[in-house]
Every structure is written in structure tokens, then in C-alpha cells.
Amino acid sequence: MGDLGMHACHFPFRMGWNPKRVFAELSKIYTERPDGKGGMAPCDTWDNAVLHCVTDIDGREVPLEISTKRLAPAEMNTWFIEVLGADRGVRFSTKEPKTVWVFERRKEQVWERYDVGHACNTFPVITGGIFEAGFSDCFQQMWAAYAAEREGQLGEHFGCVTPDEAVRSHELFDAALRSHAEQRAIALI
């Protein structure tokens, strides 16, 4: 949960979706890992964590699921977010960084794929609009957000994780560990 978890918590926390309680399902599949010296060392980290949370949005309790998975077949450092309402939803994944999926309830339930390219980035990127954006462009976005936030020029855009958000993630993960150990939901607020 630790190093991966903050990535999954950043957006919900920034939106004000703070978990009130959590029930955690933690998986420890590998007990050893390579030690970098040709041998094996004990592995004391959780491989996968699914945190079933409840948060308040507009005065109503709604479910919030935060998932971090070291073991995720066919994924390579993939991060995604999916926000679903009764009539609309949106989905984004770093696996398809130029694509946003939008759900709308019409006569049928429809997911539409929008190819937004990388021209909609908060800050200009090195790569031209007709080319595939890469790691250097993503890294540049992070540095630009840090610099803009530091100079007070970020405006309405998301900045870097705050110390308060880091503390909240640690509180959530501590409650998740207790939830797993006690096999019950743990209150946070």
C-alpha cells in the first residue's frame, strides 16, 4: 500500500472524498523476493490491497474503492481511476494516457472513448502534438506542477501531494492493516 497507495489516494483526497471507514482485503502471495545478491530475502510487503471505503459526497454516503496491486497480470505500473454515478461516469488509465472513457445512460448504457491526445496537458510538453507522448513528458508535467505550485501560479490545476494528504494516506493504510487483522470495518472519522 505504501509507495503505490499515495498515487491511488491523490485524486479522491484532492476531491474531498475522505474515507470514513474501511474494510481491507490484503493479499500476501510472495513470502520471498530476490535480494540483489543472487539469493532470496523475506518479503514483508503486501502484494495486493483492495480497500472498500465509504465517503461522503454532497452529504450522502457513497462507496469508494482504492486498490493497489503489485501482482496485476498484463499491467506494468498502471494507474487508473473510475468514477461512476447513476447516469454518468468517467474512466482514465495510464495504460491509455491519451484516452478518456465517458459513460452516459441513454436508451442504452454507453461507454464512449475520446482520444484527447496530449495537447490538453496542464503545461506544454516537449513532444509535438502528432507524436506519442512519453515518460519525459509526464516527468515534465510533475516538475512543472511543482514549480508552478511553489510560485503560486498553479491556478485551479492539481498540484503535488500535500503533507496533509500524505498523513491521511498513512491513517487510511493503518486502518486498513487493522481492518485486515481484525476482519472488520474500521472507522477513520
What are these regions (language model features)?
Residues D3-R105, C138-Q153, D174-A175, L188:
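Contiguous beta-strand/loop segments that form the cofactor/metal-binding neighborhood of enzyme cores
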Residues A74, I81, K107-I189:
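C-terminal helical cap and adjacent loop that interface with cofactors, partners, or active-site loops
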